[in-house]
Amino acid sequence: MPFPKPYPPTPIDYEDWNLLVDALEARFGSSAASFIRDRTRIINSRGNIWEKAAGNIQLAIEDILSDGGGAVWLPKGKITETSGWVVDEEKPVYVHGAGMCWHGLDRGTMIEFALSSGVHCVDFDAASTIHFGGLYDFTIFPTAGDRDAVHLDSVSDWHMERIYINQARRHAFHVQSTGDAWNLYVKDNLIENCVQKGIRLEGGVGAGVILKSYFLNNYFYANGGDVELGALDGTTGKVRLCQFHNNQHFNTVGVGMKMYRKVEQILVMGGIFYKTGGDAIDIDDDGAANKCERITIGPVNIDGQGSTPNGVDLQGYTDHVVIGPGQIFGFTGSAVNQGVNVTNVTKVGLYES
């Protein structure tokens, strides 16, 4: 006979801490008090516990790497790190916080990184591809250093969700793929005040291709540039078959979204661009062999507020671009500025003013 469940559920009434613990122990056993205390410390999936202090998150990561991978749970509060987090083995590592909060505060999980030059805040970079892993529900606030907030190389099936990155000293999220990187899910993040790019997908470092990845519902504000993708520092790799859905770009200092060299089969859907200092969307190359092609942009809304040079700037040998439906207005140059060697551009339901 199944255990009868009271309805409505019997409430837990308490007046102070001891009564709360007594009530929890009555329901869950003698470990309830320890469980509550453990929520204020760093815990990993091996069941090991560290105090909330600088350096201990890396110890928790190394501990699960020794066990083939796993998860680390961070407590509410602020931790100031003077060294970065490193995952340098081909094993899955998941780091979960207690929620985003404003930088510098402790209303959620707030990780301040005060680093020396040349060190990333969070670095997933192993000898070969890291399969699976992710970052969830906390704030990254770099206050010193000159590298990326989150840096990946050759990673697949990886998530970054509900992360707030403010004032990245270089890029907020940077894939610098010497090998292939795929199935990256970057969604529901807040990325603000980055010195350079909010998201940089660099497929040309080696032969690596960044592909089959998804960037959804991210909010960008006042970054040097919001999104940059392509064979940016070389021409061997590329970026292809990626989707950008429902991202919002506000008050970007430079270009909102830039594609440069060997970018193929990209879908930009539901984007809002507001008052970008450079072009809202810029697509270019350095020759016909490295052209960008098969790009779809729409629906899209670009409000230049009288300061954005061009809504969509198509240069080089860019080929097969579909723009619309949507609206592009408030620019100082053109809604769609098409270079002389750009071919096969189609506008569908696009209002330009």
Identify the role of each PLM range.
Residues A53-Q58, E62, G69-S117, T139-I140:
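N-terminal extracellular ligand-recognition/capping segment immediately after the signal peptide
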